């Protein structure tokens, strides 16, 4: 990687080339690559306004991209930082077509990233990523990419991969980026409403043009600006690939941030949470498999990928975030909680903790750090209930495991969890 100060001449040439491409070959995409289109993508009046100053949140998290292909052509795009915990690189999200030249079947040779008021940074193919679906088939549902910048950063947008569909209907949304039809290096913002959505796309009628591919598509949700999707395509309406659990998992894996972890009970310090997902190969309403306990040392059956599916921005004061617990032995199998009917604390616990294929709110948990340094897992669907482990009698390693893992109800879920509902996270 090298640090370069981007010259105005370089950017000007890229903008002129982008505008020329749009005149000779307009497409429905708004790519920063060959065939870039400046076709306005919403009907009616252009409501875009310039952002000034650009150095306060969330605007300081939005960057311009100068992209160079293997053919030596230069194009423009946008990107944005997201808040990811416990990673050793800075994550910049953009469109897959900003990092991978699908028609050339190769990654960009270099991308220069410039944030407002900051020195430009140039990275090469080893530090950029596009989804395998986009690389293999140009799949628009998976047209997302990642740029890895040097150094750690706790700065960035909040985001959600699990916002309920009912929250999207007619929701006001914002797009902000660096359009090619405006002065060099200027950021423009516009709002609109969501017109429809699918599991992988959000459609909307914001005015956008070429150069804005890879810019954040965000809304006010949960008390902060939250990115929901990556703006990538323009027509009437536009659409953007949604943030998904799979996307975040892949980003973390690319950043070496998806690490196996074991959950060791605080109350039973030699006992670990165990998951047997045998036969759990499709979604079924009651879930399946077995979640129980195992004596040390932990194996893959006691190992998990625990990663966020919704995060507050770096400036938020929240101490919890939503995660999934995916089995390392049985990929795509997640810890599930069903505490229907529980409305008070029960000595032996209650409800059921088992497995599910893929995820829903029953598989989402609030991860909270407890005062003793351990962690607790409170369910999103049942927000008064925590995962509980009873390891009595588990004093040797048995093949089917033993003990009980179930639920515990808290009248006030803000109070510290007991040691039976607390776990030490051990990274493998």
List the predicted regions and their residue ranges:
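C-terminal cap/linker of serine protease catalytic domains
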Residues: 1, 228-259
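Protease-domain processing segments flanking chymotrypsin-fold serine proteases, especially trypsin-like
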Residues: 1-86, 250-259
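Serine endopeptidase catalytic core focused on the charge-relay Asp
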Residues: 57-60, 67, 75-76, 88, ...
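A structural micro-motif recognizing beta-strand termini
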Residues: 66-70, 148-154, 205-210, 267, ...
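Catalytic nucleophile loop of clan PA
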Residues: 80, 86, 207-232
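Short beta->alpha transition motifs characteristic of CBS
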Residues: 95-100, 210, 228-237
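Acidic glycine-/aspartate-rich tracts in secreted/extracellular proteins
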Residues: 98-100, 117-120, 151-154, 179-181, ...
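Extracellular glycan-recognition/adhesion modules and their associated mucin-like linkers
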Residues: 257-285, 300-345, 361-397, 415-428
